[in-house]
From Swiss-Prot:
It comes from Streptococcus sanguinis (strain SK36). It comes from the Bacteria. This is UPF0398 protein SSA_1858. NCBIfam families: PRK13660.1. Belongs to the UPF0398 family.
């Protein structure tokens, strides 16, 4: 496996409204543990979709880990105008996604609902697996992407779950 799609909940979907929320540190701690394992197992591309929340937190980690591991990052945005209405703090996160080693846009702008399905299929077909923060008990629109992933026979899926986070939280020192 060489390319891994990174995606998961947006901050608001799990009730996080500020970057100072302690849960972000716990999520990042769990994700860092998993990312290191992936990189040591030979992943050399982390592919993002340019979403706030889990993806932006993992992108922060990826940029830190580049000091110690050799891999590249890619952002494949759904639309060229993605994030244009985001506030200033989120614009900085958008800029970080645009600083990836490879940046591509699936479509110039929204035209019809089939773009979402086609985009999901495209990112799955162009990655070897996914690392996703998702729990089927707390459904969001991410369920459509997850369902497509499960249909692929050889597609690796590693989920970060709330149970995983609870385990990390029990041992978390906060540093």
């Amino acid at each position: 496996m060489t390319s891994l799609l990174i995606t998961g909940y947006k901050a608001f979907e799990i009730g996080i409204s500020t970057e100072k929320d302690m849960r972000i540190k716990i999520i990042k701690e769990a994700a860092k543990r998993d990312l290191i394992r992936f990189l040591e197992d030979g992943v050399d591309w982390l592919v993002f979709m340019g979403n706030l929340g889990f993806e932006s937190w993992v992108l922060d980690l990826a940029n830190e880990l580049k000091k110690d591991y050799e891999f590249q990052t890619a952002t494949i945005f759904l639309f060229e105008n993605q994030g244009e209405n985001w506030n200033e703090a989120n614009q900085a996160k958008l800029a970080a996604f645009k600083q990836a080693d490879f940046v591509k846009y699936a479509y110039p702008t929204y035209q019809n609902p089939s773009q979402f399905r086609d985009y999901n299929q495209f990112v799955i077909q162009n990655t070897d697996g996914a690392y996703l923060f998702y729990d089927e008990e707390q459904e969001t629109k991410l369920k459509y992407l997850y369902q497509e992933m499960k249909k692929q026979e050889q597609y690796f899926i590693k989920k970060l779950t709330f149970d995983d986070l609870n385990e990390v939280a029990e041992n978390f020192s906060g540093n």
